[in-house]
From Swiss-Prot:
<feature type="active site" description="Proton acceptor">
    <location>
        <position position="117"/>
    </location>
</feature>
<protein>
    <recommendedName>
        <fullName>Sulfotransferase 1C1</fullName>
        <ecNumber>2.8.2.-</ecNumber>
    </recommendedName>
</protein>
<feature type="binding site">
    <location>
        <begin position="115"/>
        <end position="117"/>
    </location>
    <ligand>
        <name>substrate</name>
    </ligand>
</feature>
<keyword id="KW-0808">Transferase</keyword>
<comment type="similarity">
    <text>Belongs to the sulfotransferase 1 family.</text>
</comment>
<feature type="binding site">
    <location>
        <position position="147"/>
    </location>
    <ligand>
        <name>3'-phosphoadenylyl sulfate</name>
    </ligand>
</feature>
<dbReference type="GO" id="GO:0006790">
    <property type="term" value="P:sulfur compound metabolic process"/>
</dbReference>
<dbReference type="GO" id="GO:0004062">
    <property type="term" value="F:aryl sulfotransferase activity"/>
</dbReference>
<dbReference type="InterPro" id="IPR000863">
    <property type="entry name" value="Sulfotransferase_dom"/>
</dbReference>
<feature type="binding site">
    <location>
        <position position="202"/>
    </location>
    <ligand>
        <name>3'-phosphoadenylyl sulfate</name>
    </ligand>
</feature>
<dbReference type="GO" id="GO:0004027">
    <property type="term" value="F:alcohol sulfotransferase activity"/>
</dbReference>
<dbReference type="GO" id="GO:0005737">
    <property type="term" value="C:cytoplasm"/>
</dbReference>
<keyword id="KW-0963">Cytoplasm</keyword>
<dbReference type="Pfam" id="PF00685">
    <property type="entry name" value="Sulfotransfer_1"/>
</dbReference>
<dbReference type="InterPro" id="IPR027417">
    <property type="entry name" value="P-loop_NTPase"/>
</dbReference>
<feature type="binding site">
    <location>
        <begin position="236"/>
        <end position="241"/>
    </location>
    <ligand>
        <name>3'-phosphoadenylyl sulfate</name>
    </ligand>
</feature>
<dbReference type="GO" id="GO:0050656">
    <property type="term" value="F:3'-phosphoadenosine 5'-phosphosulfate binding"/>
</dbReference>
Length: 304
């Protein structure tokens, strides 16, 4: 059963709000933790493409770019189904009889494009064994936090985030679904040269989408014409995607995602965190950030 059918199950908000459990120190929904053995033993294939991100780091945007490249800029083909059906999250687990990510992935014909928010040490080992290609997208911590906070407010399948001040503390401590942002971006960065991983930055994609789309196409070994490239840039722009029901999650009932609280595609602008953090919160966050990122050579931009 698809997500759109969830309203027919007459589930209340209390039924959707997940209980959480830790798996290897990472906070997950109880449904995911109960199915962890199946997730861990997922069988990847050599021609799989995996899009890996921390939550709210540009997952859907990257997915649309990849889909457009794979389909030579054919917009109709890229609107064949909703984003979560075209490229499922392998770990996302829903109450029966709804289709979970594993169900969708296992039914897909090859070649598959799949997604995950899992930290690197929790990626099913078959992806390494099969040498699948992986695109990782990282976004600066402050913008990621604000976006994740508003997403958690509107998405009834995520834990209640509380106030922004409370959420900042949860985020810093890694006590949010999928764990610590710091460990996530560093973990994937540390293995990027050992595997077929293209590591991208959200801010670079916003600054020069043409350059970054070319990088993705090269990684996918796809030749695209200038005409197709420009088409991809246009159709994957924030304003166009925001109006695309196959990408913006508006086909879901408000009992699952309430767009009146916050749209799924909210602003997408680097530096928007400045409209939400107080000076004291920003200074405290920066001090904690320096401690947690000490020794890493990753450079993030908090505005462009």
């Amino acid at each position: 059963m698809s997500l759109e059918k969830m309203k027919d199950l007459h589930l209340g908000e209390q039924d959707l709000q997940p209980e959480t459990r830790e798996v290897n120190g990472i906070l997950m929904s109880k449904l995911m933790s109960d199915n962890w053995d199946k997730i861990w033993n997922f069988q990847a294939k050599p021609d799989d493409l995996l899009i890996a991100t921390y939550a709210k780091a540009g997952t859907t945007w990257t997915q649309e770019i990849v889909d457009m490249i794979q389909n030579d800029g054919d917009v109709q083909k890229c609107q064949r189904a909703n984003t979560y059906d075209r490229h499922p999250f392998i770990e996302w687990t829903l109450p029966s009889p709804l289709n979970s990510g594993l169900d969708l992935a296992n039914k897909m014909p090859s070649p598959r494009t799949l997604k995950t928010h899992l930290p690197v040490h929790m990626l099913p080992p078959s992806f390494w064994k099969e040498n699948s290609k992986i695109i990782y997208v990282a976004r600066n911590a402050k913008d990621c936090l604000v976006s994740y906070y508003y997403f958690s407010r509107m998405n009834k399948m995520l834990p209640d985030p509380g106030t922004l001040g409370e959420y900042i503390e949860q985020f810093k401590a890694g006590k949010v679904l999928w764990g610590s942002w710091y460990d996530h971006v560093k973990g994937w960065w540390d293995v990027k040269d050992q595997h077929r991983i293209l590591y991208l930055f959200y801010e670079d994609m916003k600054e020069d989408p043409k350059r970054e789309i070319k990088k993705i196409a090269k990684f996918l070994e796809k030749d695209i014409s200038e005409e197709v490239l420009n088409k991809i840039i246009y159709h994957t722009s924030f304003d166009v995607m925001k109006e695309n029901p196959m990408a913006n999650y508006t086909t879901l009932p408000s009992s699952i995602m309430d767009h009146s609280i916050s749209p799924f595609m909210r602003k997408g602008m680097p530096g928007d965190w400045k409209n939400y953090f107080t000076v004291a919160q920003s200074e405290d966050f920066d001090e904690d950030y320096r401690r947690k990122m000490a020794g890493s050579n990753i450079t993030f931009r908090t505005e462009i």
